[in-house]
Amino acid sequence: AVWRWLYEHPEASAAELRSAVTRIAQEVWNKHYAPIFGKKDVIAEIEGWYSCTSDTPDFWRRDGEPYPMHGGRFTGDPAYFKHVRKAAKKLMERLDLRVSDVNYFVAHQPNVQFPMRIAKELGFKEEQYLPSLQVAKFGNTYSGSSPVGLAAVLDIAKPEERILIVSYGSGAGSDAYSLVATSQILEKRKRQKLTLKYQAENPFLEYVDYTTYRRLKNGM
C-alpha cells in the first residue's frame, strides 16, 4: 500500500509521506488485524511467554516535533537485535524448546533485513521464517507487523504446529510468545474469506482512498 501511494503521488513531500505511512498502518491494523483472545474455541493456545525491557531510546519524538526520529544504526544491534534475541532465547529455554521444535518463527518486521537476520542467527531455516515475512507486501505496519506475520502463518498452520512470535517496541522491549495451533484451526479457517494472501494480491483492495488523500492535502 505504501509503494502504491508513492507511485500515485510522485510529487509528495516528505511530510506528506510520513503522514501517509502512519495513516496506512492505522487503517491496515484497525480494519483487518484485530486479534481476539479467549479461553475456549481457540485456533491456537498460548504455551508460554517472556518479556524483556531496557532503557534504550532508539526511537523518539522531541518536544514540539510532529514526527519521531530514529537513531540510525543504533536501532539495530543495541535495540532490535538485542531484545528480540533475548526474548526468543529466554522463552525457548523456559519451555525447553529447540529450534527444530518450532514450525514457524515470526519476528517484528520493520524491514526485510532485520527479521531475516535474527531468524538465521537463532538457527531457523527459510521454511520456518519466510511464511511470516510480509513487510515487502504491506510495508512497515509498526506494532502491527508481527501480528500481520502471525496472521499469515495462521492461514497455513496445521493442528499441533508451534509458532514462536517475537514483537519489538522502541524504548525498548520485546515480548515472545509460543503458540500451538489447535484442531479447530482447520474448521474455522474455512469461514475466513479475507485471508492475508488475498489482501496482499487483490489489485482492487485499496487502503489509501480519496478521503485519505483529501485529509493529507488539508493537513490531516
Would you name each region that the model predicts?
Residues S100-H108:
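Short glycine-rich phosphate-binding loop at a beta-alpha junction
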Residues Q109-K125, Y177-S178:
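Short glycine/threonine-rich loop-to-helix capping motif typified by GTGT followed
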Residues P10-A14:
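Charged, low-complexity interaction regions
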